[in-house]
């Protein structure tokens, strides 16, 4: 499929316009691209290895790489000594039911009857009248300039951060961190202490879990320590060989449940209330699941405790094992992402072999057509990662947020931003998303 002209321009508009659409910072989230593979982003250093990454938010915003399955998102930093994954759950919001003083906004009697009129007015080109009707009938109590409304409305928030210390202390060479858009696999490779280390991570939609595997070309080299931190009111505990973190959002009582299991090849695994410790293993696969008790049930917006479903989901994923989980994930993702290819010209091989951050800087002066193709495909990747059947829609930052009080609460702006997230779904052949 060769996409040119208006489709190309629409994609650029959708990716860039509005500042905080699905790709609110695609120029920042587009770190480094592939040597010989036109669908791979790659770095020659960890996310926190850049001069502007001394501030954690800069490393997150500009250099970490995103994974997601619509329900669960992660930003990966790729440090040799410690892997850092910032985590998101698609329904983790503050505010709303449970906050003192909150009450459901009353329905506007007769509002639904005005929707056909608003649509016809728009089709007739009378935007001023359509705006006036929408303002009158399609509205509700939301955030504004008053602090009390912002508190009641709440915000989309981070769950917290997963850290996996590797014990790597020797100098590191041949470092490469990559995200293959065609498979949605994140990899880290490097040499240290005479061994070659490899990590593979992905967020599976079929099995609703995050998977991170640590391996090396020498036996017994995996000595890992996993811990999880969160700004919410949560506590960790060991439960039947699984590390469980449970609690609530402080202001509204939304229940949170995240579970991590480990599959070790050789060595020993110890699970405690503080995390997971693996010693002298040949390879280790961590599997993480998570959820909240949010449900689309007015007016409480609460459903079943997520613990039972997470316990069942994690057990099923651990039974499948790494190879089968990966196979199912890649097949699911590629069935969507592999539908569309673009050809807007070619870039010399010597340029395509550069890390993408270098290519981005170079592109300011010398056009890189293959980089534009990569940009297009990265947009499709992010829509797949942040919006899948059954999940909430992509918000102002898709699925990824590392704060408690983010810009515009990373909510759903119906004036234009939510629509912009999904403009590319047609030209990108992703209508299921």
List PLM regions with ranges.
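N-terminal secretory signal peptides that target proteins for export/translocation
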Residues: 1-11
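Bacterial N-terminal signal peptides
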Residues: 17-28
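Aromatic-residue-lined binding/catalytic grooves and analogous aromatic/hydrophobic interfacial grooves
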Residues: 34-433
């Amino acid at each position: 499929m060769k996409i040119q002209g208006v489709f190309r321009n629409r994609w650029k508009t959708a990716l860039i316009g509005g500042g905080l659409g699905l790709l609110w910072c695609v120029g920042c989230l587009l770190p480094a691209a592939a040597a010989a593979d036109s669908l791979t982003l790659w770095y020659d250093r960890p996310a926190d290895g850049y001069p502007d990454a001394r501030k954690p938010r800069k490393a997150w915003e500009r250099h970490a790489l995103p994974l997601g399955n619509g329900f669960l998102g992660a930003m990966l930093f790729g440090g040799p000594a410690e892997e850092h994954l910032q985590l998101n759950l698609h329904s983790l919001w503050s505010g709303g039911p449970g906050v003192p003083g909150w009450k459901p906004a009353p329905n506007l009697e007769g509002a639904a009857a005005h929707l056909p009129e608003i649509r016809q007015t728009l089709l007739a080109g009378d935007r001023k009248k359509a705006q006036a009707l929408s303002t009158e009938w399609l509205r509700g109590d939301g955030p504004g300039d008053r602090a009390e409304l912002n508190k009641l409305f709440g915000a989309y928030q981070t769950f917290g951060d997963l850290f996996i210390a590797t014990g790597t202390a020797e100098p590191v060479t041949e470092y490469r961190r990559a995200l293959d858009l065609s498979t949605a696999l994140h990899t880290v490779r490097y040499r240290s202490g005479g061994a070659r280390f490899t990590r593979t991570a992905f967020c599976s939609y079929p099995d609703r879990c995050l998977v991170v595997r640590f391996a090396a070309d020498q036996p017994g080299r995996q000595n890992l320590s996993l811990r999880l931190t969160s700004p919410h009111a949560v506590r960790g505990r060991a439960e039947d060989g699984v590390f469980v973190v449970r609690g609530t959002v402080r202001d509204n009582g939304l229940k949170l449940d995240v579970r991590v299991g480990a599959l070790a090849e050789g060595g020993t695994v110890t699970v405690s209330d503080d995390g997971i410790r693996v010693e002298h293993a040949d390879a280790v696969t961590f599997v993480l699941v998570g959820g909240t008790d949010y449900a689309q049930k007015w007016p409480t917006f609460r459903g079943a405790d997520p613990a039972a479903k997470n316990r069942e989901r994690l057990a099923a994923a651990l039974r499948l094992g790494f190879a089968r989980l990966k196979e199912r994930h890649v097949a699911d993702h590629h069935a969507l992402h592999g539908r569309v290819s673009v050809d807007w010209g070619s870039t010399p091989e010597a340029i395509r072999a550069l890390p993408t951050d270098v290519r981005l800087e170079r592109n300011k002066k010398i056009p890189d057509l293959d980089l534009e193709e990569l940009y297009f495909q990265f947009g499709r990747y992010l829509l797949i990662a942040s919006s899948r059947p059954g999940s909430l829609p992509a918000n102002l930052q898709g699925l990824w947020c590392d704060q408690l009080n983010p810009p515009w609460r990373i909510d759903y702006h119906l004036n234009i931003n939510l629509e912009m997230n999904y403009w590319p779904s047609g030209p990108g052949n992703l209508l299921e998303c």
